[in-house]
Amino acid sequence: AARRVRDVQDRLEAIVRAYVLPAFTSGSDLAGGGTRFTRLRAIMSAEGNEVVRKIIAQTFDDTSHAFIDAIHDSLPHIPRTDLVWRGHFLLGALYYTLVTPERVSRLSRGSAEGTDAGHAIEELVRATVAALQAPPLDPAISAPRRAPGFTPGRALT
């Protein structure tokens, strides 16, 4: 369906919005709703339980592949692997937004309301689309950069 939208920017926004919107919907539903379920999924994902990981993979990997494929169809010049990473970061931002909305209110000193789902969705869509459209990493440049004196595995003091 996304292919019908000719403008790439509009298409990407529609794809990302369709992907994140269910996480914010039905938050007032007493049965749980999208917001509560996504919060639970975020917390369970962070716990690292292998059984939970398998359940989440079986339940959501098909949707994640469809999302990544739709983005890749729109941005064929970006390696799919880069888009996988960017989609991964989207989930982190989505989870963090739903789990700690009060942080937005606090850091904005009250000028933004972290529980404003509509605003959160639009900011998340805009930031994600910008990240998705970023140029692919140049392998020669993307090698890990180390701070002077940094030794891998050594604790920083």
Give the location of each predicted region.
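Hydrophobic alpha-helical connector segments
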Residues: A1-F37
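Short amphipathic alpha-helical interaction patches enriched in hydrophobic/aromatic residues
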Residues: A2-R3, N49-V52, L75
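Short, surface-exposed loop/turn segments at secondary-structure junctions
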Residues: A2-R6, K54, S108-S111
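Residue-level recognition of alpha-helical structural elements
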Residues: V8, L12, L30-G34, V52, ...
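Non-catalytic, well-ordered alpha-helical scaffold segments
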Residues: E13, R17, T35-R39, V84-L91, ...
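Short alpha-helical scaffolding segments that buttress acidic/His motifs in well-ordered protein cores
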Residues: Y19, A23, T38-S45, L90, ...
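C-terminal peripheral helix-coil segments that are non-catalytic and often amphipathic
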Residues: T25, D61-T157
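Amphipathic alpha-helical segments used for helix-helix packing
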Residues: L30-D61, P101-R106
